[in-house]
């Protein structure tokens, strides 16, 4: 959880809102809008604060071994992570213009904290292909970005349950 928190501090979501969404929406702190009656305003939020993110990564054991924030950090005493493992992710998304713009901003902000990111833009047919070979539904990624919406006022909580994890039992079409 602390690694995820550090990553959240390192994501410049305001730059995404300003540059890709033209400032038309606030930066979300959960997948439920702050204006929604079920939004929990007491939840911890993680504003863009790369210094706090890097400090937390150091505390956890993700060390900047070469004093170069542009190279990935390495594990040194991170719980359940072999020493020397790079803090690096593969980020997959579609080749749509907005997805490219978002990936550029987020990957650059992560790299600024010493988190390695390799971005892969797949064709929609490749990205949404059925599992186990497809990128999204085959769960062949570390980070993935795609758009989802709902047509009801009820938040789509069921999308994030265990039964929605794509696998052979649900024909690789779960939404979690």
PLM region descriptions:
Residues 109, 142-145:
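Ligand-binding pocket segment of bilobal, Venus flytrap-like solute-binding proteins
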Residues 91, 145-146:
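Short beta-strand segments
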Residues 35, 72, 125-126, 151:
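Positions that flank functional sites
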Residues 4-5, 17-18, 55, 116-132, ...:
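Extracytoplasmic/peripheral linker and loop segments enriched in polar/acidic and small residues
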């Amino acid at each position: 959880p602390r690694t995820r928190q550090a990553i959240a501090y390192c994501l410049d979501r305001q730059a995404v809102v300003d540059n890709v969404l033209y400032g038309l929406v606030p930066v979300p702190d959960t997948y439920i809008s702050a204006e929604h009656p079920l939004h929990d305003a007491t939840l911890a939020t993680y504003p863009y604060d790369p210094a706090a993110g890097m400090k937390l990564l150091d505390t956890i054991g993700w060390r900047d071994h070469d004093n170069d924030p542009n190279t990935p950090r390495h594990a040194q005493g991170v719980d359940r992570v072999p020493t020397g493992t790079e803090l690096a992710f593969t980020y997959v998304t579609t080749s749509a213009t907005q997805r490219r713009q978002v990936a550029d901003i987020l990957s650059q902000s992560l790299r600024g904290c010493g988190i390695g990111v390799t971005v892969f833009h797949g064709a929609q047919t490749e990205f949404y292909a059925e599992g186990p070979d497809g990128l999204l539904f085959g769960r062949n990624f570390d980070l993935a970005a795609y758009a989802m919406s709902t047509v009801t006022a009820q938040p789509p909580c069921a999308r994030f349950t265990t039964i929605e994890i794509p696998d052979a039992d649900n024909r690789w079409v779960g939404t979690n």
